């Protein structure tokens, strides 16, 4: 306790400094642009590079934000990221190839790649535009598309194997097609002389905005001849590539009678890395234990994992949805309204049929009948095959459910077109799976290899299954070119069209800028849009200027000119801008691309936020970054041009920083 000490004519007060007042939180920059993954349009604060990479992914040669974030976070501890994704989606044609010996099962699908003149509109499946030569077999067939013929094979040892002729990368610029889906197990199951068929199809529609990925409905055991749809799990990240990054495991399923002090059953839920053939495949990222469906319990599923998510309208207004804060870094619970008043005996025992990632019409030619996409199948559905590891031995840690090592099943982990249906896919239930004789090591109560699993008769360590994610979508055509560096043009920077205020890319960036425009909600002191250039993307940069001036508490580092701009052009490009909240720099600089490992030219805004962060760390905030200590560009190999004193003076006088 503070003590007051008194002496003649002098009064002093001793202050106890054991408890210091809480300081003001760090305020950092905001970066807007595309990233590999992460929540779209939701301003998200990261405090170190590891956190950034967990949420938004690592370096990507097509995007600038990851590089800029890495440089910035070396010198600062707070950074707000606003990821942009596509709006409106796309539609295009699909070539579907099947094999007759497998019941006309679909063997592969092809779509227009970046190499097509117009990937969104290339007609590849109309009358006469795609055809097969007569007599084509699995070993050798010829596909002709718009007058160009390709010698192909579904024999993986052939030099003409389909993925050796066509890439599976939609960004392939060398051919007009890429392999969208490749069902290798179906191909391997066909005979070498089985004939190849082709299906004509109309546009396949993905005409909607970006989406997160979701599991099929997790379903209960069979009660009165019916299964109850319980809940879904959704990813916090949006985008197409999130479908294949993770899978959900559900394990330790116990009936209520085996849970002391509860009228409800319980289970555990895991977030698992999905990366077949790699060292990290199967790594458990998160494990939530002893979950239940009792709304009054601290272990209530949505309460433990969380169900909150944020939506944003075209004006950038953010709306928070859900009741329980997210405790997971990867997922949230959704679609769980059926848990209200649920029968206490119900527990998760399977999931609904996965949806088909194609909705093409499959009337085939080159053979009889119609094609069908391969059907989902599940582990343990034949006698004594439950819980086998990759070596074929019993392993109590192995899951039932979808076989993620089956390459055909990996094709399910994809965006879902409009009106997607289950097709021939079927539901999965542990009650349709067999145990294993070696499960006797678990104790006296277990299910052997000749009997089906049950909630009452099986050991809880036998009751576990894994579930796929589907439906994550970038909101744009994956084959659209992603131009960077000196290739940036008005209608394409990193895959976004910013050529006018109404262009879809401009709408995405404007929505992201609006999201951080409220100073009462988001504290920032710096804004950068790496790769957005005022001279060719003025609809976006002018909007950013308006919002940053309205905030009046942050600074906008803006790229004024393209790589090719002369000094006079750089001056002319920004001469109408007179703002105390905007800075532009000249010229472009060369850095080392960490992904490609070679030098590349980038606009100044890619590197300058890191310089500002270093300046604020060793100098004073709001002091101009200058001199050898505070203005050094340590990551820059060279500038496009070495400026003379007179040229620097000319730039300074016209409000351009050299």
PLM feature segments, named:
Residues 1-658:
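Subunit-assembly interface segments of extracellular/virion macromolecular structures
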């Amino acid at each position: 306790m503070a003590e007051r000490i008194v002496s003649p004519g002098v009064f002093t007060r001793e202050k106890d400094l054991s408890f210091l007042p809480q300081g003001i939180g760090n305020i950092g920059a905001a970066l807007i642009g595309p990233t590999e993954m992460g929540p779209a349009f939701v301003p998200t604060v990261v405090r170190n590079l590891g956190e950034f990479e967990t949420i938004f992914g690592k370096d990507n040669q097509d995007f600038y934000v990851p590089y800029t974030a890495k440089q910035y976070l070396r010198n600062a501890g707070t950074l707000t990221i606003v990821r942009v994704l596509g709006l409106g989606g796309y539609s295009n044609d699909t070539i579907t190839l099947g094999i007759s010996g497998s019941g006309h099962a679909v063997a592969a699908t092809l779509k227009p790649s970046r190499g097509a003149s117009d990937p969104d509109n290339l007609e590849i499946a109309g009358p006469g535009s795609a055809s097969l030569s007569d007599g084509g077999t699995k070993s050798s067939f010829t596909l002709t598309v718009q007058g160009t013929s390709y010698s192909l094979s579904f024999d993986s040892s052939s030099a003409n194997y389909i993925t050796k002729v066509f890439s599976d990368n939609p960004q392939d610029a060398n051919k007009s097609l890429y392999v969208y889906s490749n069902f290798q197990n179906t191909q391997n199951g066909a005979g070498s002389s089985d004939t190849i068929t082709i299906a004509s199809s109309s546009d396949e529609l993905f005409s909607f905005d970006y989406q997160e990925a979701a599991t099929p409905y997790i379903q209960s055991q069979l009660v009165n001849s019916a299964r109850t749809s319980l809940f879904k799990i959704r990813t916090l990240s949006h985008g197409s590539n999130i479908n294949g990054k993770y899978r959900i495991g559900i394990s330790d399923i116990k009936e209520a009678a085996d849970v002391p002090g509860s009228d409800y059953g319980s289970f555990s839920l895991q977030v698992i890395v999905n990366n077949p053939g790699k060292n990290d495949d199967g790594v458990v990222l998160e494990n939530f234990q002893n979950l239940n469906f009792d709304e009054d319990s601290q272990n209530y599923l949505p309460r433990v994992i969380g169900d909150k998510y944020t939506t944003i309208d075209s004006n950038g207004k953010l709306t928070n949805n859900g009741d329980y804060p997210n405790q997971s870094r990867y997922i949230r619970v959704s679609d769980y309204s059926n848990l209200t008043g649920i029968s206490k005996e119900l527990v998760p025992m399977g999931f609904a049929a996965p949806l088909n990632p194609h909705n093409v019409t499959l009337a085939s030619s080159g053979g009889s009948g119609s094609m069908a996409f391969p059907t989902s199948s599940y582990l343990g559905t034949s006698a004594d095959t439950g819980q086998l590891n990759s070596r074929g031995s019993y392993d109590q840690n192995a899951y039932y459910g979808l076989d993620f090592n089956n390459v055909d099943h990996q094709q399910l982990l994809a965006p879902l077109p409009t009106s997607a249906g289950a097709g021939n896919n079927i539901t999965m239930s542990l009650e349709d799976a067999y145990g294993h004789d070696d499960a006797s090591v678990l104790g006296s109560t277990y299910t052997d290899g000749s009997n089906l699993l049950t909630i009452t008769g099986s050991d809880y360590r036998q009751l576990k299954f894994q579930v796929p994610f589907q439906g994550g979508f970038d909101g744009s055509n994956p084959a659209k070119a992603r131009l960077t560096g000196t290739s940036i043009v008005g209608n394409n920077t990193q895959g976004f069209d910013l050529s006018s205020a109404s262009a879809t890319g401009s709408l995405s960036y404007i929505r992201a800028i609006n999201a951080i425009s409220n100073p009462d909600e988001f504290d920032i002191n710096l804004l950068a849009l790496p790769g957005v250039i005022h001279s060719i993307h003025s609809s976006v940069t002018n909007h950013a200027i308006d919002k940053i001036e309205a905030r009046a508490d942050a600074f906008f580092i803006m790229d004024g000119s393209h790589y090719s701009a002369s000094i006079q052009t750089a001056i002319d490009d920004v001469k109408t801008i007179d703002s105390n909240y905007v800075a532009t720099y000249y010229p472009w600089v060369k850095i080392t691309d960490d992904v490609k490992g070679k030098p590349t030219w980038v606009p100044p805004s890619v590197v300058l936020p890191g310089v500002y962060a270093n300046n604020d760390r060793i100098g004073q905030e709001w002091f101009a970054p200058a001199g050898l200590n505070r203005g050094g560009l340590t990551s820059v190999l060279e500038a496009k041009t070495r400026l003379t004193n007179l040229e620097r003076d000319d730039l300074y006088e016209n409000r351009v920083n050299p």
